[in-house]
Amino acid sequence: MSLRLPQAISIQPRRSVGERLAVAIDRAQSFLRPRTPFTALNTVWRHIDREASSLLDVGCGRGEPMRFLAGKLRLSSTGIDIFAPYLRECQRGRLHGQYVLGDVRRLPFRRKSFDVVLCMEVLEHLSEEEGAQLIETLERLARRQVIFTTPVGDWDQHEFDDNVYQAHQRIWAPAEMKERGYRVWGQGLRNLGGLSGIQSPLPLLLRPLVDVLWVLAGPISHSRPELAGNMVCIKNLGREAT
C-alpha cells in the first residue's frame, strides 16, 4: 500500500543545530547498538521468531530498528505511526513494505493479522490506561509473538521535532510486564538513558561516555532488568521462537 500524505507537510521536522547533531549521534548509535551484545535491538534480533512471515512495526518512528532487521529477516512488514514526517522518512528509505498513517491507540487491523508485532519505545508515550489497552490489543493482533522495548526508571522526555507525541507519560516496571506473561531482559543502567538522548542535559561530547557506561552495564542488567535503564519484553503466543 502506497502512503500518500499532503504535500504541505514538511518531510524534515524543524531542529536546532544541537538537536541535529544529537540526531546524527543517535543514528551512529543506531548502527552500532544492534551489533553490540546486550543492547535492546541485539536482544530483539536474538529472540525474534525466525519463522515469521509478517511483522507489524507499531509506532515505527523513523524506522531505525527496521534498517537492521529488514536486512536479516525475509518477511512482509507494515509500519504505522501518527507523525507524518517520520513516516515519510521511513517511506523514502523503503524500510517497510507498506505504511499506515494512524494512531496506535486505534489500530486499523484485524485480529491475528501478523506473525510478529513489534513495538519499540512506544509504551512510555501513553498513559497507564492507554498503555495497558495497547498491550492487550497487540496480543490480539499477533499470531506468534509480541515484542516491546521501553525505558525503566527515570527517563524524562518532552516533545521535540514538533512532535507532541514524543513526551513521556508513564514508565513501566519489569515486574509489571512479567505479570503479564512476558520474558524480560534489561539493557544499560537505570536512570542513565535520558543522559544520552536528544534532550540530554549533558554537553554533546560527554554523551558518548554515558553510552560506554550503558554498554558496560549490559552483562549485569541483562538478567536483572530492575537495574536496567531499558527493557525488552517478549511474549511467545505460539510455539517458542527459535
Protein language model annotation of sequence segments:
Residues 42-155, 233:
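Conserved SAM-binding loop
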Residues 3-10, 19-39, 64, 82, ...:
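S-adenosyl-L-methionine-dependent methyltransferase catalytic module, highlighting the catalytic core
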